Amino acid sequence: MATATTMTLDEFLALPETEPPSEFACGRIVEKPMPTWFNSRLAARLAALFEIYFMAHDEGYVNVELRHASREERRAYVPDVSIARWERAPRTASQRREGAIEQTPDIAIEIASPDDRPARIADKLAFYLRAGVPLVWIVDPDERTLTAYTPGRPPTVFGEADTADAAPVLSAFRLPLHDLFSVLDRGLEPGS
């Protein structure tokens, strides 16, 4: 839900953090939906799989719910998971302690939740692509799909039996979607 009062990006960034994190678009605070169990498990699994990859390929780093701000777009979004290459990492300890990173990630990953409106996801996707994010993944836990978006190309939809890659950002990363979505079934009662 958006608040009625408009403000600047600087005013928004000066506010104390909220739980779940708030986002900022069109001069308004936008409450990010509280993640479901499915969303939380998928975000944790994605972060772990990228961390394992980065231990073998020291190309970048993964963050969970890190706010990325764009002054040009006057927006601040909190991807569920974000990836950046090391050459784009904040260079000072104080920059790393600040609440928002004033750059877009190299990969933005959003995990759709039941409370997400399609227009909200479409707005975030358009922002990421306009702001120059080379790869955006939208993960749908209900459909068990991952849709990959890159600027200037049609989206690619991967199903649970497919393997997604992270090109053009990470050329060697491969994600068998069964490995990702299997966390949703662990411990379930049969037939539930």
Protein language model regions, located:
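Gly/Pro/Ser/Thr-rich low-complexity, intrinsically disordered segments predominantly at protein N-termini
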Residues: 1-192
